[in-house]
Amino acid sequence: MAEDLAKQLAGYKAQLQQVESALTANGENEDLLKLKKDLQEVIELTKDLLSSQPSETADDACDDMSASGSQSWKVGEKCMAVWSDDGQWYEAEIEEIDEENGTAAITFAGYGNAEVTSLLNLRPVEEGRKAKEDSGNLPMSKKEMIAAQREYKKKKALKKAQRIKELEQEREDQKVKWQQFNNKAYSKNKKGQVKRSIFASPESVTGKVGVGTCGIADKPMTQYQDTSKYNVRHLMPQ
C-alpha cells in the first residue's frame, strides 16, 4: 500500500512540474490553473495517507490480539454499539462481520444509521443497557481507545482516498479537453496556411515582385544597373 502511494506521489509531482512549465507560457489558462490546484491538493492528500500508514500497521497487531479474545458475534445478532458521532451507546443489529479486519457493519435500531465499527466496540444488549443506565456510558479501555482511533483514521483515509479518486477523474476530464483544444488549434492553423507564389503581388506599396532563379540554379539574381545618373539631355542631339 505504502509503496503504491509513493509511486503515485512521484507521478503527481512530475505532472505538477509539467503543468507549471506550461503555465510559464500560458499563465492565464483556466484549465491549467485548475489542473495545478487539483494536483497540489492530491499531492497533499497522498502525503497524509503515506504518513498514516505506519501507525495503522502498528495498530493492526494490537487489534488482532484483542479481537482473538473478544466475544463471538453473528450476523443478525442484536448488540449495543457506540455511535461515532456522539460516542454514546445505542442498540444495533449486526449486518456483516469482517473477521480479518475485526470489524462489523451495523445498523442502529430505530434510527437506520449504518456504519462500520470495531468488534471491540460491541457489547451484549443486556450488558450494554445496564451499563448505560448505571453510568450513562461505558468507559473505554486502552485497547478500545486504540481501536476507536484506528477506526477514525480508517474513515479519514477512506475520505481522502475518495477525494483523490474524484480529483483524478477531474484531471482526466481536463486532459481530454486540453487535447481536444490542441487538436482543434493545430487543425485550424494547418487549414489557414496559404502557399504563396514568389510572383504574387506584394502586400505593401514598397514591396517588389521576386525574381526566380528557375533554370539557373546556383547563379545570383539578376543585377540591374542604376540609370538615374543619365539625364534626358544626354540623349538630345547637340
Swiss-Prot record:
Location of this chain's protein in the cell: Nucleus speckle; Nucleus, Cajal body
Keyword Nucleus: yes
Nuclear localization signal, short sequence motif: residues: 142-160
Annotated SUPFAM superfamilies: Tudor/PWWP/MBT
Residue ranges occupied by any Tudor domain in the UniProt entry: 72-132
UniProt xrefs under Gene3D superfamilies: 2.30.30.140
InterPro entries: SMN_Tudor (IPR010304), Tudor (IPR002999)
Chief location of this protein within or outside the cell: nucleus
GO biological process: mRNA processing; RNA splicing
Superkingdom as given in the UniProt entry: Eukaryota
One cellular component (GO) term of this entry: nuclear speck
This protein's domain notes: The Tudor domain mediates association with dimethylarginines, which are common in snRNP proteins.
Name recorded for this polypeptide: Survival of motor neuron-related-splicing factor 30
Organism of origin: Xenopus tropicalis
